[in-house]
């Protein structure tokens, strides 16, 4: 045990080891509070005194929630050497987190965003104080749990740090080689002398490598044999990186370098975040310091990402989930554009559904006023045009080979890899289940909306039939009036046109039968047992009640226990006979559990999901055809209504002229009577006939006026009840 005046620690209770110091877990003598005690070794004292004091001076200047706090500088009781009393971080480092099998293919998106936020926050504080860290890596980013239960990451280990302004440079070498800037790598690792000086932006390269590692679980630049076994190829990769690339991997010995500007498919970050993050990585992973972004642009771009809100969207036809990263002050117009970038559905074809109802976003509506969404409760987007069904895109990863040879180091590495694959399969199984549940929900809601559209079309068709019937009766009565006018030799040029309109109205009336038949066909397809019913969605695929994810998790828990035991075995370096036999049995169990898990994943999760995907594609194709048919019928009803309205308007104009024509008819009879003296009987008959004709015409005009009044009242009553938004079909 060692101690200072206020703290003590056991030499066996070590937290970490570095080139110049060890860190122990210690306690305050009076309170018992835990602290991290940094004790410098003999190598550290070989450094110049000013270099030894530099870490103390740097830490004294820093005070930020994302920097490990320095509480005191004390002296060890026996040696009188300086020790640092620092904040204790019980959850280890980011490296510890990335070593977990569950993070073998990168952190979950929510955790990655916390890393991004905290590292950027810590680095910004360093820059404000004119300090360059020079050894940014996952092992130097500590983790604690905050009061809200979320992770908080803090920069630590400022042994390599020094004060340096943006326009200053340095020539000394520090850092960990996988995370080193290419210019520093050349001198520090390859031992090649050059006259280059390094600026503060060398930290940006290390940050880029760290962020890529956190996002994917792997280093971005990897020779076939590994970064430390083939340093020349490693240097070739990091100096030869094309502009825009964020990774370079050699997949075969002496093989070519595979460059990529995108994250690997196995990465758990959403596409919405990746499109924002990859340009940042591409521009800070830049060997040429002239082309590399400066800190100002780096902070501006990362701040832009961190200040965005997320709107969850699910594309029903494509069966894909999306996260739309958008500023709270952005409008619905920008939201539709961002949806297009991820789904390729143009804005005019995007129909939105939220919690079973159509969601209409006014163009100027701000994103902060959108409905609240989650992965389980997103906004559904449906395209009015055909789309290819895509589904979840994931990497099909096979189990690594298990070598029968007994090897503690190799077995620990193998256990980590094989457990990581099953963790990945478990995550994919959970996502596949979520996608199927969202499809079931979306299909159910869409069917209800189509039924609403169908009912509105039926309602509109009923309106049209009533209007058409009134119009036909009106035109028939108008024809009778004009025919009577013709009987007294009064010219009625409109009669031919009226008869033509009557014929057209009868033709329109006969077309109602075809529309009715089509509507009945649609109704039968939407009814239970019809081709568009959703019964299949509850029969196909996987369901929560199957508990497939839970079954995989049970096997994964067994594997994880074996993995942790293998880590302990590796630390022991050598096992007694009995422990060695247990180790060998566990190795067999590990492979058995892994094989069983992957078989279950393939047979029960993947195959059933693919069957569901195929059925979904077939249903969506039928649904789109039905909606187009329904839209066509609706448009036919509106077209008929418009045509009938035009004929009715013309008829009304004719009716307005009838009183004048009747007056003309009465006058014309008087003037056209022959001057001879007819018999008294003839005069009486003519007078009675004219009186009767006049009464009939007046009766027809009155009836026509009443019909028009009824039509007007009917129109006003149904105006609010008709289809308002036909484009929604």
UniProtKB/Swiss-Prot annotation:
The UniProt-reported impact of residue 355 to R is:
Decreases phosphorylation and kinase activity. Abolishes dimerization
Where do the Protein kinase domain residues begin and end? Answer: 9-310
What Pfam families does the record tag this protein with? Pkinase (PF00069), TBK1_CCD1 (PF18394), TBK1_ULD (PF18396)
Q: Which domain of life is it from?
A: Eukaryota
Tissues expressing the protein: Ubiquitous with higher expression in testis. Expressed in the ganglion cells, nerve fiber layer and microvasculature of the retina.
Q: Where in the cell is it found?
A: Cytoplasm
Q: What is the effect of changing residue 581 to A?
A: Reduced phosphorylation of STING1
Provide the effect of residue 207 to V: In IIAE8; uncertain significance
Q: What is the effect of changing residue 508 to I?
A: No effect on IFNB induction
Impact of changing residue 693 to A on the protein? Answer: Almost abolishes interaction with TANK
Disorder noted:
Glaucoma 1, open angle, P: A form of primary open angle glaucoma (POAG). POAG is characterized by a specific pattern of optic nerve and visual field defects. The angle of the anterior chamber of the eye is open, and usually the intraocular pressure is increased. However, glaucoma can occur at any intraocular pressure. The disease is generally asymptomatic until the late stages, by which time significant and irreversible optic nerve damage has already taken place. GLC1P is characterized by early onset, thin central corneas and low intraocular pressure.
The protein's job, in short, is: Serine/threonine kinase that plays an essential role in regulating inflammatory responses to foreign agents. Following activation of toll-like receptors by viral or bacterial components, associates with TRAF3 and TANK and phosphorylates interferon regulatory factors (IRFs) IRF3 and IRF7 as well as DDX3X. This activity allows subsequent homodimerization and nuclear translocation of the IRFs leading to transcriptional activation of pro-inflammatory and antiviral genes including IFNA and IFNB.
Q: How does it assemble?
A: Homodimer. Interacts with DDX3X, TIRAP and TRAF2. Part of a ternary complex consisting of TANK, TRAF2 and TBK1. Interacts with AZI2, TANK and TBKBP1; these interactions are mutually exclusive and mediate TBK1 activation. Interacts with GSK3B; this interaction promotes TBK1 self-association and autophosphorylation. Interacts with SIKE1; SIKE1 is associated with TBK1 under physiological condition and dissociated from TBK1 upon viral infection or TLR3 stimulation. Interacts with IRF3, leading to IRF3 phosphorylation. Interacts with RIGI. Interacts with CYLD. Interacts with OPTN and TRAF3. (Microbial infection) Interacts with Borna disease virus (BDV) P protein leading to its phosphorylation.
Please give the name of this protein: Serine/threonine-protein kinase TBK1
Give the gene that encodes this protein: TBK1
